[in-house]
């Protein structure tokens, strides 16, 4: 894929997110720009620019296809669009087989976890960052016996969380 795809995606994203602001009150387009700068390759950059377009704007996948976005990019975008009826960590696990979706979601989670971007950090922000840390652990790889290591926690594929002491296991449902 050449640079035309990522440039097209950037143009679509800038137009689609015009007037939107993030939690810190800054132009929302700065978020996809940061995510795009954090991934390698034109296809990944195109996905990064567009990763929130279908969820957060009136544009549809059909609109993107009509504007020239490739099937490869649209496939990754469909995976990245979270169906709220699917538990969050199950949705995150579904991204792992697609390298574009996985790379963009990791960059997205890392940027969204950066609480230093916010003027004031609330308890809700801290809970969201903890949720994202678990998602990053899922995407970064699976350890032995179904465990995924991440930031002092061990997240099991079956949806349980434990620190290094098995008696402290808790349901991940409280983090969804």
Would you name each region that the model predicts?
Residues 1-176:
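Active-site helical microenvironments for divalent-metal-assisted chemistry
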């Amino acid at each position: 894929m050449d640079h035309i795809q990522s440039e097209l995606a950037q143009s679509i994203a800038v137009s689609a997110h015009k007037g939107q602001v993030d939690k810190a009150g800054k132009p929302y387009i700065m978020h996809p720009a940061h995510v795009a700068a954090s991934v390698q390759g034109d296809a990944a950059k195109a996905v990064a620019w567009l990763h929130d377009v279908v969820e957060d704007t009136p544009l549809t996948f059909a609109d993107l296809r009509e504007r020239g976005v490739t099937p490869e990019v649209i496939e990754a975008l469909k995976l990245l669009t979270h169906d709220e009826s699917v538990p969050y960590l199950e949705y995150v696990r579904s991204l792992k087989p697609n390298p574009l979706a996985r790379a963009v979601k990791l960059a997205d989670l890392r940027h969204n976890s950066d609480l230093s971007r916010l003027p004031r950090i609330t308890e809700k922000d801290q809970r969201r960052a903890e949720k994202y840390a678990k998602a990053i652990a899922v995407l970064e790889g699976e350890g032995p016996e179904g465990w995924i290591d991440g930031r002092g926690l061990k997240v099991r594929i079956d949806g349980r969380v434990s620190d290094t002491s098995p008696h402290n296991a808790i349901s991940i449902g409280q983090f969804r």
